[in-house]
């Protein structure tokens, strides 16, 4: 949000001046302008301030999407505050605004990268406090990005540059975060307590899934077990109560269903009357008709349409759903969640197929017309292969000769310049636009991009650095790219807060301050504006 820095500075300046007058000479060392600068550079004082601010942004964006599906939003998953900071700095640099660009906190990455137990699978085995801790860390880094950029602008203003308008219209790096609470880490009270911590850390949107908490699996793996709707609704209520208690009245709940790929349920809900929610859930459970004399000791029996049936129960006590019931269960999950307090939906799917997603969402919209989806553009999908397969089937249906393609080997590089590859890549490129328009997708996210980019970059750097290229691998592949692309971290001392700290030391100690940013600081080598002066000096010396 813009146009607040100026009023913030003026208000802070007046406040400090009044305080100095109130407390007299004991405050003589406090410079009103310096204090006002520090207030301006730290707009958000608490995580709750952030949650309220970002919730309002999401609500506005949701309304904009309802009016025009071109107004969809996006995010990338981040596993460290620094990663989130660099993402938002890059967003501002390349796109000139943070509008409709969010952050995503993935439970998968918390488990894999942030647990004190070491790397873990996505099964809710990591300590639950790691989730709010990461949210807090992310917003600490984003607030520092604000402070660094504004500090630079104030320095330029002091040096006579005309940057007042940039200060007055400064856009914060703080954006909404959709935070993954898995299945709630326990019962509804546990969900409520953890949600409070996440909101207090700054989260305005909580994503919760309908799996059994202590048997949770990654949405793209087998063995998923879902809970009856009554249990899930209790957790939706717990999240809403947490938002209301903390004064984040616009807080967003994202209800995720894993039913598309889940074939098991842990327990059978109690139906109070035919056709109620529990009855609808029980209708999906696979059962075999039996006579009363065929029942075994301790069998669980149900009466269905006047007949006795025995639910199919596995050796571990779990009950099995009917084959082919998954899509109907997804639709019922979504409708039920929206009718019981959820704001957005999340449907885990086996492949990224717009038409398949739209088929489910459109059924939901028949009951809840403004239903909107958060969709996981997951790295668990082989995007290249999925879309080449889709296009292969389309081209075949169009009557094209496909004998030149091996359907079992479409990932082969030999097809990279083919018509099939061109059409597949075009569909990947427009997937998010198409999904927003046709499948009700309000928010597109990639859960684990920075997990994969870290691995890829280390693969590329180590190949050359420990090989024939040596130091050139780093210089050519990293530093030179940072310089030429204007990546802020090329001056890593500044990004870590060194210049900001020097400014603070000057405020605190005046001329006695021992600062890091002097002429002997090697970061000066990256100051492009000084290069012509150095070259000129060398030429004059040679002459």
List each model region and its residues.
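C-terminal functional modules
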Residues: 476-543
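Non-catalytic helical/linker scaffolds that mediate oligomerization, partner binding
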Residues: 243, 278, 463-469, 543
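Substrate-binding cleft of secreted/luminal carbohydrate-active enzymes
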Residues: 429-462, 469-502
